[in-house]
Amino acid sequence: GKVLEYILEVEKCIFAIKINLLIVMIKTNYSKEIILIAAVSENYVLGRDNKLIWHISEDLKRFKKLTNGHAIIMGRKTFESMPAALPGRKNIILTRNKEYHAKDAFIAHSIPEALRLSGDDPFPYIIGGGEIYSLFLPIADKIELTRVHRTFEGDAFFPEIDMSKWILHSSEKNNSSINQPYNYSFLTYTKIK
């Protein structure tokens, strides 16, 4: 009983120390501004059944404008949800599957490897999915978020943002229209240093 609880508590502490050491190592060895970019609902839903729930053309235009010419890092499921690798960007897939191969994309099996593959790009973008965002959030410097002002049912979620560590740098609200049924905002958060 008590011994098992103690062992579990010690293991949690060791895991937390390992994570913090990994963060320090990554931030020391890679002088990059790591940027998360996502579209999320009010309840942090990213999508359902490996698809986006909404289609907001202005969000897609913004995504293309911001990520074009940069390395984009994503999980396998995100890559497989797209018809092909995104043009004009260095596509990097982070996966645990050592046998995985993909056309027009680089494969990484760890965060440091994904960042190394981003080369000399000082602004690699993390484009999803939920698990990948959770891995990169502790080392991210900026978040480019499209907040869809509605709740949705979904099975992929963006990690909750600890607002004590981030500052809202800019905000642009967009109202629904005939072609666009959702109110949404473009939000840029920067990490408090």
Which residues does each PLM region occupy?
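Enzymes that bind and transform nitrogen-containing heteroaromatic metabolites
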Residues: 25-193
